[in-house]
Amino acid sequence: MRNPLFFAMLLPMFLLSTSKTPPIVVPLETVKSLPSLYFSDCSSTGEWGANYKESILEILKDDIDASFHLDLTMGKIDIEPLVSGPMKNPSKELAAFSSDFVLLPKFEGKTLIVKLYEPRFHQTHLIGKVDLGGTLVEDRQKIHQIFDLVHKKIFHQEGIASTRILFCKKTEDIEGDWISDIYEVQQDGHNLKKITSSQNYLITPIMIPNSKKGEGYDYVFVSYEKGQPKIFKGNSLSPSSTPLLSLRGNQLLPALSLRGDK
């Protein structure tokens, strides 16, 4: 056992060293502010009814919220007339002009025109024009594509609002055997569509990147059609599919490069 005198001598030295050495503080950024986006109200023009226009703008708002990349503020006035000419001092005091970006939607006839205004530079950019058909199921995808263009303008990177999700749903046939088919749904959970009609067991569907042509795209999946699991390739607009590889044995869990070339 050490002599108590030994500890008594060490204690003043320890207290002296701690009093001279300040604590080390490492600041960590735990909250990163998002770019602010002011969603301008738009005048009640255009050929569509108020309810339909509200539904269209609600889809656009939901895409902004679902991106988790923007701090959204919904406006109650139409900002576009204020930014179309020289900026007046009273206008600068509005909340919209303290935002990083102002979204300017506008209906003209059957078309939705979307612009993006940057208060810092007093610049307005045309994002795109959407010819609406009056069917929300079809127009929804067009609005998703418009938001992806907004996302690219702000962040210089494609958004994912217009992407689709593939999944398999397992069911029991009349003989009690389990089968499954591949379904498609938009990223917001709408427009569910069955894209295969097999009497087999299908699993792990993956969309092939950069294969989209019009409304169609290629995808790969695993099928137990031939007994052993094999990787097949299909197209969303065609009911048929073909084996992707001629290798023997089990083929499971296909993976693709980001470009879809490997």
Task: Label each residue range with its predicted role.
Residues 111-113, 174-183, 227-233:
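Structural motif
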Residues 17-63:
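A structural "domain/chain start" motif
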Residues 79-80, 186-203, 234-252:
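Multi-bladed beta-propeller domains
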Residues 85-146:
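Amphipathic beta-strand/beta-sheet edge segments enriched in Tyr/Trp
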Residues 106, 166-176, 209-211, 219-226, ...:
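Beta-strand C-termini and the immediately following turn/loop, strongest in propeller blades
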Residues 18-35, 123-194:
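C-terminal/domain-edge helix-coil "capping" segments
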Residues 48-61, 65-109:
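Short, solvent-exposed, polar/charged sequence segments at loop or secondary-structure edges
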Residues 138, 153-159, 199-222, 241-243, ...:
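Conserved beta-propeller blade repeats
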